[in-house]
Design a protein with these regions (language model features):
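Conserved catalytic region of serine esterases and O-acyltransferases that act on ester linkages
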Residues: 121-128, 132-150
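Alpha-helical cap/lid subdomain in secreted, periplasmic
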Residues: 1-131
Length: 150
């Protein structure tokens, strides 16, 4: 319904080693990875703004959780690049979302063990959060909203 709360998850598939931004960067090495991310995020959020004008939903954008992949299956260089892509993507997603009046559900901070990799507490597989992880992300989101009021 119009004016309802809507959670949208964008970019999770873009932020994998084998799909999205990293393979695109490898195919077009002259492109800067930050520019690829910036354009990707801008395009997602502009699409949402344009398609939400009639309904006026209260949009909350979900961030990208830290990767929970088996690091033994990938080179250290690829792992480092993945962590950096997810970090930059989340930063842009958060900043641009707030700039457009959207909320931001930070699943990256929740899952980060300190080095950009998953702490292993909230995932159900390599990429997706468990129901408990989502509940904890929402609990923290509510705490942030309460704090921002002061």
């Amino acid at each position: 319904p119009k004016y309802s709360d809507v959670l949208l998850a964008v970019g999770e598939i873009d932020c994998r080693i084998d799909s999205g931004i990293i393979p695109h960067k490898n195919k077009f090495p002259e492109k800067e990875i930050k520019e690829i991310i910036l354009t990707t995020v801008e395009n997602y959020l502009t699409y949402i703004v344009n398609n939400n004008s009639d309904c006026q939903h209260n949009v909350i954008i979900q961030g990208i959780p830290c990767p929970n992949i088996d690091v033994r299956n990938h080179s250290q260089k690829n792992i480092k690049q993945l962590v950096e892509v997810i970090r930059i993507f989340n930063y842009e997603l958060k900043m641009q979302s707030k700039g457009k009046g959207f909320g931001f559900l930070d699943t990256h901070q929740l899952t980060n063990k300190g080095d950009g990799m998953s702490n292993g507490s909230w995932h159900i597989d390599d990429y997706h959060l468990s129901p408990e992880g989502m509940q904890e992300a929402w609990r923290r989101y509510g705490s942030e909203k309460s704090y921002e009021q002061f």
